[in-house]
UniProtKB/Swiss-Prot annotation:
Taxonomic lineage: Eukaryota, Metazoa, Chordata, Craniata, Vertebrata
KW Phosphoprotein (keyword) present: no
Gene field: COLEC12
Organism for this UniProt entry: Bos taurus (Bovine)
Extracellular side stretches: 59-742
Subcellular location: Membrane
Low complexity: compositionally biased ranges: 501-514, 534-556
Pro residues bias spans: 516-532
Name assigned to this protein: Collectin-12
Length: 742
């Protein structure tokens, strides 16, 4: 019984334990023995009834439990399915939310980083805008200064134009003066020529007079000699006459003792008388000749005195003319010196104004280039800022749309979860009502479940404390050269310059007040004799003069016909060595093949001096500045042309050869057609190295534009107005074999 009861008890307990239901309390046995049997019988009966009832109840309970377990299993399955679906949905939602959260977190982090970058950019933009404001203020100040400078330049240009007009007027006046001076000089030259002609005539007359004086002196000397001879002859005649008188006296004395000889002496006396008469005649002739000679001498002396007076007058006139011409020449030289000094001052002023204008144009070009660079940079920065702001706006709009979608999805998911939670609450309440009568035992812990998915990345932790200052690193490589900064403030006034050139001569002042009369000075030296007066009236005709002297010997007559050749004479002694003769005629011409001219020795690279070689070309880098057309003409005169750059190697070599901070013309222009750049030989560009934003044809109504190209710093190309002054580079082919000039 006990065993059966225990088995039943075990079965019931097993069945109850199976469903987690605890057993009920057992019946107490009667202690009385008499009642034991009854109780045992009743117990058997009750046990049988109980077994039957328990079996029936168990069956019913089992059926109900089966139904309940089936319903619970179905409900559990449904709930499991729902829970799995909910879990899958939650997982999906979790994955989606995780992905979306990750994406949103990444997007938010990117958005935050973008916002931080935008804030940083906005800060930089604000700083740049503040700097740009400062720079704009500086630019405005510089623009105002430029406007003031331009107004000053306009004023200076107007003053310079006025000065140039005045200079032109003065130059025209000086041209008039110069023409007048040229006319005066031509007149003076004519006068000088006439004076020279008259001077030559006077010199000829003087030479003739000198010749006549020499001839007269020779005649006078001859006359004096003849007079001396005549005087000697007269003395001789006188001596002879005295001797004759003495002889006559002796003859008278001796007449007594000569009477005897009278007859013999009569003939002698007749002869002597004839001789005496002849002597008397000769003496009378000599006296007449002497008187004629004295008259001629008087005439000659008067003529010589007149000639001397005329010579003195001519010398005085010549001296006066020379003094006048010297005074005029000194005045003209002084005037020319004044004109030269004025012209030098004018030329210096013009050169200074031209240099000042060139410096102004170069400064304006530099300011223009810097302004264009800054404006292009500002425009690029503004365009980039506008693009970034537009991108930020688009990103913010897309993020807002994504946030709205996420909010709507979250709202729908939360609503679904709230509905599912309400259903779960209802199911839990039903389960609670069903399992109120059962005591649920806590079972043993189940097996360990599979490893879950990796959780989401947590939010970043708080920023840590600032670390210690690290060691000083090594100095980095030097950075690239920064942009050119703004123009600094005006410096202090410089030192006083050197003394300028002498100014123009001032205008003549007003006439001063007359001074007090001074004391009477001493009498001066007598002046030079005045010029001779006019010729007087012709005097009365004088008596006929004496017979003139014998004239000079005439020129030799025409030689007669040549006679027959005589016999050859004996050879004479060798004569004295004569002086060296004149140089003989030039010899025969040297053949052209042997005649060479020295040429400038070229360098070993095949280029002339001051030319540089690269590959098969020669290049000339100018040291002076010139206009584009003048530079082109200069290169053409040197049998070359402005440089054509067709390769990068050539560009790099030219860049290395350039002098810093100097611009150079190249043979590139768009004068024929705008914005179609061609080399001077008409070919199109094969290689380009324009600066960023160039060519821009920067004119803006201020001129014809920029139609000529050149090299600036770092060898980049830029367009310039053709009227600018720049250095230039000439190019020509290298001469491999220099022919010898024959």
């Amino acid at each position: 019984m006990k065993d059966d009861f225990a088995e039943e008890e075990e079965v019931h307990s097993f069945g109850y334990k199976r469903f987690g239901i605890q057993e009920g309390t057992q019946c107490t046995k009667c202690k009385n023995n008499w009642a034991l049997k009854l109780s045992i019988i009743l117990l058997y009966i009750l046990c049988a009834l109980l077994t039957i009832t328990v079996a029936i109840l168990g069956y019913k309970v089992v059926e109900k439990m089966d139904n309940v377990t089936g319903g619970m299993e179905t409900s559990r399955q449904t709930y499991d399915d729902k829970l799995t679906a909910v879990e899958s949905d939650l997982k999906k939602l979790g994955d989606q939310t995780g992905k979306k959260a990750l994406s949103t977190n990444s997007e938010l982090s990117t958005f935050r980083s973008d916002i931080l970058d935008l804030r940083q950019q906005l800060r930089e933009i604000t700083e740049k805008t503040s700097k740009n404001k400062d720079t704009l203020e500086k630019l405005q100040a510089s623009g105002d200064a430029l406007v003031d400078r331009q107004s000053q330049l306009k004023e200076t240009l107007e003053n310079n134009s006025f000065l140039i007009t005045t200079v032109n007027k003065t130059l025209q006046a000086y041209n008039g003066y110069v023409t007048n001076l040229q006319q005066d000089t031509s007149v003076l030259q004519g006068n000088l020529q006439s004076q020279m002609y008259s001077h030559n005539v006077v010199i000829m007359n003087l030479n003739n007079l000198n010749l006549t004086q020499v001839q007269q002196r020779n005649l006078i000397t001859n006359l004096q000699r003849s007079v001396d001879d005549t005087s000697q002859a007269i003395q001789r005649i006188k001596n002879d006459f005295q001797n004759l008188q003495q002889v006559f006296l002796q003859a008278k004395k001796d007449t007594d003792w000569l009477k005897e000889k009278v007859q013999s002496l009569q003939t002698l006396a007749a002869n002597n008388s004839a001789l005496a008469k002849a002597n008397n005649d000769t003496l009378e002739d000599m006296n007449s000749q002497l008187s004629s000679f004295t008259g001629q001498m008087d005439n000659i002396t008067t003529a010589s005195q007149a000639n001397e007076q005329n010579l003195k007058d001519l010398q005085d006139v010549h001296r006066d003319a020379e003094n006048r011409t010297a005074a005029k020449f000194s005045q003209l030289e002084e005037r020319f010196q004044l004109f030269e000094s004025d012209i030098v001052n004018i030329i210096s002023n013009i050169s200074y104004t031209a240099h000042y204008l060139r410096t102004l144009t170069s400064n304006l070009n530099e300011v223009r280039t810097t302004c264009t660079d800054t404006l292009t940079k500002h425009t690029d920065d503004l365009t980039s800022l506008n693009n970034t702001l537009a991108n930020i706006r688009l990103d913010s709009v897309s993020l807002r749309m994504q946030q709205d979608l996420m909010r709507s999805r979250l709202d729908t998911e939360v609503a679904n979860l709230s509905v599912i939670m309400e259903e779960m609450k209802l199911v839990d309440s039903k389960h609670g009502q069903l399992i109120k009568n059962f005591t649920i035992l806590q079972g043993p812990p189940g097996p360990r479940g599979p490893k879950g998915d990796r959780g989401q990345q947590g939010p970043p932790g708080p920023t840590g404390n600032k670390g210690q200052k690290g060691e000083k690193g090594e100095p980095g490589p030097p950075g690239p050269a920064g942009e050119r900064g703004p123009i600094g403030p005006v410096g202090p006034p410089g030192e006083r310059g050197s003394k300028g050139s002498k100014g123009l001569q001032g205008s003549k002042g007003s006439r001063g007040s007359p001074g007090k009369p001074g004391p009477q000075g001493p009498s001066g030296d007598p002046g030079p004799p005045g010029p001779p007066g006019k010729d007087g009236l012709p005097g009365p005709q004088g008596p006929p003069g004496f017979q003139g002297l014998q004239g000079t010997v005439g020129e030799p007559g025409v030689p007669g016909p040549r006679g027959l050749p005589g016999l050859p004479g004996m050879p004479g002694m060798p004569g004295i060595k004569g002086p060296p003769g004149p140089p003989g005629p030039s010899g025969a011409a040297v053949p052209l093949a042997l005649k060479t001219e020295p040429t400038t020795a070229p360098e070993d690279n095949g280029c002339l001096p001051y030319w540089k070689n690269f590959t098969d070309k020669c290049y000339y880098f100018s040291t002076e500045r010139d206009f584009f057309e003048d530079a082109k003409l200069f290169c053409e005169r040197m049998s070359s042309h402005l440089v054509f750059i067709n390769t990068g190697e050539e560009q790099q070599w030219i860049k290395n050869q350039m002098v810093a901070k100097q611009n150079y013309w190249i043979g590139l222009t768009d004068l024929e057609q705008e914005n179609e750049w061609r080399w001077l030989d008409g070919t199109l560009l094969e290689y380009k190295n324009w600066k960023a934003g160039q060519p821009d044809n920067w004119g803006h109504g201020h001129g014809p534009g920029e139609d000529c190209a050149g090299l600036i710093n770092f060898g980049q190309w830029n367009d310039f107005p053709c009227e600018d002054m720049n250095h230039f580079i000439c190019e020509k082919d290298r001469e491999r074999e220099l022919a010898i000039t024959l």
